[in-house]
Amino acid sequence: MRLIIRPTYEDISKWAANHVAQKINEFSPTKENPFILGLPTGSSPIGMYKNLIELNKNKKISFQNVITFNMDEYIGIEENHPESYHSFMWNNFFSHIDIKKENINILNGNASNLKKECEEYEKKIKSFGGIMLFVGGIGPDGHIAFNEPGSSLTSRTRIKTLTQDTIIANSRFFEGDVNKVPKNALTVGIGTIMDSQEVLIIVNGHNKARALKHAIEKGVNHMWTISALQLHKNAIIVSDKNATYELKVGTVEYFNDIERKNFNNDLK
């Protein structure tokens, strides 16, 4: 696993955006051979999305031949609800770039058969040969997507009950009212994410420091689902300084030393 540590959230957002753009550009996608990109929601990737929008406006990256799969969606709220993940993605990213609507895939939390919706999502990912780069964030308890503590590390796309901690954390998007937050969601599984060719996780803030410690310095543990990345052959965590405060000094120095040449990844 690689750990890229940069001073601020703005720095890691720029780094993540540049990394995504570089991967797409290196692949040189076409209509017949598209790039398959996994995407997250939440506060962590917003800065990355802003940077990718600018790169797209400046014609340094195109999304015309990129197919996206989002990580998750709430169950029981309409797609046009202001806090649905459909709305989040269109408001914060898709409506600002040159992606084709038919290339966007987001789970339908109002499907008549939710189990079938999850199964079909997995099949569609496999039909494209799998996800090439899956970008994600984590919660303070180390969850990826809605794979809460205790989730199977081989889990697939499924229905998931949200923990009270996640409901409280997400209430900030629902006028601070926990009663307005959906209690269930559809989410890709840890196994789904681990099948990707590459995983990039954005970690920022003091409240993520304990989760980062479990990801980097502790063993693989289903109570900290982020720790599964230790088993991935091509995983990167990009973290701001605030999120590293529970890591050992030697750990931080080690990763800073071996990744120093990769701190600046600006597009040429």
Curated annotation (Swiss-Prot):
Question: What function does this protein fulfil?
Answer: Catalyzes the reversible isomerization-deamination of glucosamine 6-phosphate (GlcN6P) to form fructose 6-phosphate (Fru6P) and ammonium ion.
Q: Write down the EC number.
A: 3.5.99.6
Query: Catalytic site residues?
Result: 72, 141, 143, 148
Which Pfam families does this UniProt record tie to the protein? Glucosamine_iso
GO biological process terms, semicolon-separated = carbohydrate metabolic process; glucosamine catabolic process; N-acetylglucosamine catabolic process; N-acetylneuraminate catabolic process
Q: In which pathway does it act?
A: Amino-sugar metabolism; N-acetylneuraminate degradation; D-fructose 6-phosphate from N-acetylneuraminate: step 5/5
Alphabetical list of Gene3D superfamilies matching this protein: 3.40.50.1360
Organism lineage reads as:
Bacteria, Pseudomonadati, Spirochaetota, Spirochaetia, Spirochaetales
- Species of origin: Borreliella burgdorferi (strain ATCC 35210 / DSM 4680 / CIP 102532 / B31)
* PANTHER family tied to this protein: GLUCOSAMINE-6-PHOSPHATE ISOMERASE
Task: Tell me what gene encodes this.
Answer: nagB
Q: Which GO terms describe its molecular function?
A: glucosamine-6-phosphate deaminase activity; identical protein binding
The catalytic activity, as recorded, is: alpha-D-glucosamine 6-phosphate + H2O = beta-D-fructose 6-phosphate + NH4(+)
The protein depicted here goes by the name Glucosamine-6-phosphate deaminase
Q: How is its activity regulated?
A: Allosterically activated by N-acetylglucosamine 6-phosphate (GlcNAc6P).
* Database matches in InterPro entries: Glc/Gal-6P_isomerase, Glucosamine6P_isomerase, Glucosamine6P_isomerase_CS, NagB/RpiA_transferase-like
Q: Where is this site: Part of the allosteric site?
A: 151, 158, 160-161, 254
Keywords from UniProt, A to Z, are: Allosteric enzyme, Carbohydrate metabolism, Hydrolase
